[in-house]
Amino acid sequence: MENKVTAYSIYNKKAKKNTKVNPLDEVFPQLPRKKYQVIYADPPWDYGGKMQYDKSTIKSENEGFKRDIFISSASFKYPTLKLKELQQLDVPSITADDCILFMWTTGPQMANSILLGESWGFEYKTVAFVWDKMVHNPGRYTLSQTEFVLVFKKGKIPTPRGARNVRQLLQIHRGQHSEKPYAVIDGITKMFPALDKIELFARNNFVGWDNWGLEIPDNKIEIPTQGEIDENK
């Protein structure tokens, strides 16, 4: 009997080749020896190698399928981490007595995100930002179109504060995989312009911020100006 080719058999073959691996001996690089009042984090959540579908590449392997298969996973783009691994990160060592944490999450990782924030010594407060990506992905229940930035607090809200009119809803077209809109870090900067701030799992090197991660550019740049509403929608 001829073996049936399935989407998962294609994925499993690609996964071993494409999965990104942390190049460090330790799970994490060394954190700064400094206390921060503002922390902005985009944890590299592990989704168990979840496949994504799209009418796109690997056309030679799409024969016999009703729709084209696009083999992709977060783990193909960067090293991902499970909740227990993220909880090992010694964030408490860099938090001031009064500190606020802004953390990116998705619907499936909402509960884990709250557990992670609590394990780092914070109390969950609310949703700071809702990002409408202006395009939907397949979802198990409804079509997925949003990501969220949760806000956690340790002690009191740090002072001095800046802007009090930063909008929660951002309607901005998504960019590259896992790329987040600049409007979020710009908004946080406006809310807390004078405080010590650090971006965890950073891929940028912005003026006014310290950063930590595996993919940080050498040169500092200004935060690009980006409106809360995408004019190209």
Curated annotation (Swiss-Prot):
GO terms for molecular function: DNA binding; site-specific DNA-methyltransferase (adenine-specific) activity. Belongs to the MT-A70-like family. It catalyses: a 2'-deoxyadenosine in DNA + S-adenosyl-L-methionine = an N(6)-methyl-2'-deoxyadenosine in DNA + S-adenosyl-L-homocysteine + H(+). Coiled coil: none annotated. InterPro entries: DNA_methylase_N6_adenine_CS (IPR002052), MT-A70-like (IPR007757), SAM-dependent_MTases_sf (IPR029063). SUPFAM superfamilies: S-adenosyl-L-methionine-dependent methyltransferases. It is an enzyme of class 2 (transferase). PANTHER family: N6-ADENOSINE-METHYLTRANSFERASE (PTHR12829), N6-ADENOSINE-METHYLTRANSFERASE CATALYTIC SUBUNIT (PTHR12829:SF7). Its EC number is 2.1.1.72. One of its GO terms (biological process) is methylation. It holds the Pfam family MT-A70. This is Type II methyltransferase M.MunI. The keyword Chloroplast does not apply. Keywords: DNA-binding, Methyltransferase, Restriction system, S-adenosyl-L-methionine, Transferase.
